[in-house]
Amino acid sequence: MGMKKKLSLGVASAALGLALVGGGTWAAFNDIKSKDATFASGTLDLSAKENSASVNLSNLKPGDKLTKDFQFENNGSLAIKEVLMALNYGDFKANGGSNTSPEDFLSQFEVTLLTVGKEGGNGYPKNIILDDANLKDLYLMSAKNDAAAAEKIKKQIDPKFLNASGKVNVATIDGKTAPEYDGVPKTPTDFDQVQMEIQFKDDKTKDEKGLMVQNKYQGNSIKLQFSFEATQWNGLTIKKDHTDKDGYVKENEKAHSEDKN
């Protein structure tokens, strides 16, 4: 018997193929039946739709706020357990400002609101920000897995929504009235909306010359890059009532399709 496996897990897709073929003969009078058994995995396919413009931070002044909306839909065949958000950046320009550090510029921006389940229902919407979290720490935690930044974020974002990978889960969890809508299931049909509010800190501190300390950021600009990773539920011991007549595991389209500990 030969067996090959190929497993590919990515931000929004998964594929697993395994085929088993068996057959044999015996004696002069026999009846040979050959069956091919094919096991094919489902797919994780997350559609992230941005409901507002790209997040370009330029020509802003201290005190300004901007709002970003995201919508997630499940275009795959497996229920999505988490949608993990990571932050990166690109295209930083000093533009004549005395500050030349993109991370220092990120530290001037705070996430003041991160609303999960904005569409409502099942105990949501819920703001998971406990205290203002700056973009520098979110970047260092999610992109660099920085331990110090992670410790700070634990006090600023509801720990239930923090993943061990250093990313923030922005999908609904622990629904109060309809747990079948936790995550982003395929069945029943669902979508999740997330709203984020970012504010340019208004620091009134002045230096010894009487100049605002934030003057060094004048002219700076940066582009924020958000990425979203869909994850599956844990493994499930398949029972007869989990499949249809063709062997399709319909149970895996649902939230909480995993063995209970």
Curated annotation (Swiss-Prot):
Residues 1-27 form the signal peptide. Keywords: Secreted, Signal, Sporulation. Residues 241-261 are annotated as: Disordered. One of its GO terms (cellular component) is extracellular region. Forms fibers. Fibers have variable length and are 10-15 nm width. Interacts with obg (AC P20964) in pull-down experiments. This is Major biofilm matrix component. It is found in: Secreted; Forespore intermembrane space. The gene is tasA. Belongs to the peptidase M73 family. The keyword rRNA-binding does not apply. Disruption phenotype: Mutation impairs colony surface architecture. Mutant forms pellicles with less extracellular material. Deletion of the gene results in the production of asymmetric spores that accumulate misassembled material in one pole and have a greatly expanded undercoat and an altered outer coat structure. InterPro entries: Peptidase_M73_camelysin (IPR022121), Signal_pept_SipW-depend-type (IPR023833). Induction: Part of the tapA-sipW-tasA operon. Expression is directly repressed by the DNA-binding protein master regulator of biofilm formation SinR and activated by the extracellular matrix regulatory protein RemA. Also positively regulated by the sporulation transcription factors sigma H and Spo0A and repressed by the transition phase regulatory protein AbrB, probably indirectly. TasA is the major protein component of the biofilm extracellular matrix. It forms amyloid fibers that bind cells together in the biofilm. Exhibits an antibacterial activity against a variety of Gram-positive and Gram-negative bacteria. In laboratory strains, is also involved in proper spore coat assembly. It comes from the Bacteria. GO terms for biological process: sporulation resulting in formation of a cellular spore. Coiled coil: none annotated. One of its GO terms (molecular function) is identical protein binding. The keyword Aminoacyl-tRNA synthetase does not apply.
